[in-house]
Design a protein with these regions (language model features):
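Extracytoplasmic/periplasmic, Sec-exported soluble proteins
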Residues: 38-41, 106
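Weak global preference for isoleucine
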Residues: 10, 18, 22, 30, ...
């Protein structure tokens, strides 16, 4: 009988199955890392926006002069966020000494994340002694249609 060398079909299928499992695992890790990076970017941009508004309008008695185009131009950043939505600034209608940062264009899971995240410098977070996140949101829309509001000021 003659000796044959090479791989059998079963061995090749085993190798392909292992490679498939590795690929699925790597894809999940990459997706998680990208989601975390986007969330961190939004957090940093909100901090930059809040700092900019306070520096530009902090000397006034209230934030009634807030203007999206002027503020974003003055702080040197776009009002676009990493989710393809926008940031919006506005005066709190119940208290002109407070301003609201709105994050638009979020998926349901990202909206829920930002609503539960501790926005430590926000009005509601400080009033509750850290028991509330400081954000409110509408997270029931379709992906890309959800928004989160965070109030800052006194």
């Amino acid at each position: 009988m003659k000796q044959e060398s090479g791989r059998s079909m079963i061995e090749m299928l085993g190798v392909l199955a292992i490679m498939g499992v590795i690929t699925v695992g790597a894809t999940a890790l990459i997706s998680s890392a990208m989601r975390t990076q986007k969330r961190n970017t939004v957090n940093e941009e909100v901090i930059q926006i809040v700092t900019g508004v306070r520096q530009l309008l902090g000397e006034y008695d209230d934030f009634s002069g807030i203007d999206n185009k002027k503020i974003f131009g003055a702080i040197g950043m776009s009002n676009k966020n990493t989710y393809g939505g926008t940031y919006e600034l506005g005066v709190d209608s119940s208290n002109p000494r407070q301003f609201v940062v709105t994050i638009n264009g979020l998926s349901k899971s990202d909206c829920e994340y930002f609503v539960t995240k501790a926005w430590s410098d926000s009005v509601e977070y400080q009033k509750s002694d850290g028991k509330q996140s400081g954000a409110t949101g509408n997270c029931n829309g379709e992906n890309g249609q959800n928004s989160v509001r965070i109030t800052y000021g006194e």
